[in-house]
Amino acid sequence: MVNTSFETLPRHMQMEILSRVPLKFLMKFMCVSKKWASIIRGEEFREDYLFQSMKRPRVLFVIDHREYLPIKPEAFFHSVYQEDQPLLLSGKQRMRTFETPLVQVFQPIRGLICQQGYGKIVICNPGLKKFRSLPQIKVHKGAPMRTFFGYDEDKDVFKVLCITWLRNGKRSEVSKEYLVYTMGSDEESSSWRLITCEHDHAPVTEGLFKGGVLYYGAKSNNGKSVVMSFNVNSEDFSVIELEVEISPYWRLVNYKGDIALMNNIEDSLYHSREFEMWVRNEVTGNWDRTSIKISHWNGTVDGKTFYFKGTIGTKELAFAPDYWFGEQHFVSYYDTETKNLRRFDIEGMVDQDDFVRTFFDHVDSTWLI
């Protein structure tokens, strides 16, 4: 029998083996061998590793933890494989990315998340416990700021869209700026670029990134509810008309391949719960309204307040609480075709009372390694 070392294996076999290694061990491997480090940092390996990770997507919990006296805001990241039963924690990543509490966290894209604090934005890879701070945006004190996160597949770069606006004493809008930041795989510093938008609007909902386009609910300058789309590659805005008035309680999701709006207001009726969803037909451009009634709701969630958080894949609706009170944690999935409501208990979560943001279909990535 011939002894074969890792170093003597063909490069494609080395990549195949490394693509199955957990992120925390990849970091150690990079310190052992310059050759391994070169492979792990490569673009080809990054795509292979992402592909393997997509086979077992995770639920990501971003916990806005605050300690008082003195105030020490921190972000805790927990992740679990979203189809295992029970959901077993793969560990906790702890990062202090801000001196102030989190304001906004965008959906994970290719293993990265974009976080906004007061006047500060960072892009981080929770699996690696690494982050990159973006240049400070100069805004007047108290001026609102909304951030959205996307990926340009053609140029292999991430982009952050930031919208700031000022108001006068009567709360009417005075001015608005649209800024874009581009982040590639290298560590070269970039800067915010001012772009133009011909459709004056104010963001209302959180965003959805799908197929190279950012979508978010907004109010036009005449107060009408619309969905704005932003092509991450061309950096062009367009308006999608709506037939319903929206508020921050509405959430945009990818539902069976189409973009959909779902009302996230708590509205339980006895033991059931009913949601209103508007699904856009990509061919006709029309919005179709559907009502989703979930039976046995209260019995599954133990009477707790759960909110719609997104979809698993593209068809199962996922629900989780906004706040945990040091008790048994779990998430719920609802299949709109089979009408099956599933509960997944989360084992190993530390008991604590914190505000929690829950994201689904998160994957591990070697970006920022």
Curated annotation (Swiss-Prot):
<dbReference type="Pfam" id="PF00646">
    <property type="entry name" value="F-box"/>
</dbReference>
<dbReference type="InterPro" id="IPR017451">
    <property type="entry name" value="F-box-assoc_interact_dom"/>
</dbReference>
<dbReference type="InterPro" id="IPR013187">
    <property type="entry name" value="F-box-assoc_dom_typ3"/>
</dbReference>
<dbReference type="InterPro" id="IPR001810">
    <property type="entry name" value="F-box_dom"/>
</dbReference>
<protein>
    <recommendedName>
        <fullName>Putative F-box protein At1g70960</fullName>
    </recommendedName>
</protein>
<feature type="domain" description="F-box">
    <location>
        <begin position="3"/>
        <end position="54"/>
    </location>
</feature>
<dbReference type="InterPro" id="IPR036047">
    <property type="entry name" value="F-box-like_dom_sf"/>
</dbReference>
<dbReference type="Pfam" id="PF08268">
    <property type="entry name" value="FBA_3"/>
</dbReference>
